[in-house]
């Protein structure tokens, strides 16, 4: 042990043991933590810490591959004949507020349709809430 309380290897074998333990710890980390660590290490070499913190805060809630892209939303909405912005029937049957460009969701939307368009159909794959940053199952 050093004066500061942290162990420092002083032989090549010690360095090898330290490196192997770091590799094992990295393999045990979950996918989100690996992703955050990679982002931090890449950004710290190019930007100041406060900018890295802002970038990390904005990128941590979205994981690629869960079908939350705009293209996936449009594809699912078109599949069930709804507008991807306001969840109303599109093309409108009669006088509707939906023009598929500037429309907004109404006061009472069909939550099942909104969940399907936003997150997909499966209920067993967990997704990350942008507000909590935690995994939980999609509601019906």
From Swiss-Prot:
Segments of this protein annotated with the region Basic: 73-76
Protein name per the record: RNA silencing suppressor
Pfam families in UniProt: Carla_C4
Keywords: DNA-binding, Host-virus interaction, Inhibition of host innate immune response by virus, Metal-binding, Suppressor of RNA silencing, Viral immunoevasion, Zinc, Zinc-finger
Positions annotated as zinc finger (C4-type): 83-98, 83-103
GO molecular function terms attached to this record: DNA binding; zinc ion binding
Presence of keyword Chloroplast: no
Family, similarity comment: Belongs to the carlaviruses nucleic acid-binding protein family.
UniProt key word Methyltransferase: no
Species of origin: Lily symptomless virus (LSV)
GO biological process, one term: symbiont-mediated suppression of host innate immune response
Protein purpose: Suppressor of viral-induced RNA silencing. The potential mechanism of action is based on sequestering siRNAs.
């Amino acid at each position: 042990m050093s004066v500061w309380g942290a162990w420092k290897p002083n032989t090549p074998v010690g360095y090898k043991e330290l490196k192997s333990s770091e590799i094992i710890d990295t393999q045990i980390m979950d996918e989100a933590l690996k992703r955050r660590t990679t982002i931090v290490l890449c950004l710290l070499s190019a930007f100041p810490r406060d900018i890295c913190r802002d970038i990390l805060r904005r990128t941590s809630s979205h994981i690629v591959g869960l079908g939350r892209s705009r293209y996936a939303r449009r594809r699912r909405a078109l599949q069930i004949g709804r507008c991807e912005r306001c969840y109303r029937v599109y093309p409108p049957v009669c006088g509707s507020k939906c023009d598929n460009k500037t429309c907004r969701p109404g006061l009472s939307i069909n939550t099942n349709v909104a969940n399907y368009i936003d997150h997909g159909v499966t209920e067993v794959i967990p997704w990350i809430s942008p507000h909590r940053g935690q995994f939980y199952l999609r509601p019906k």
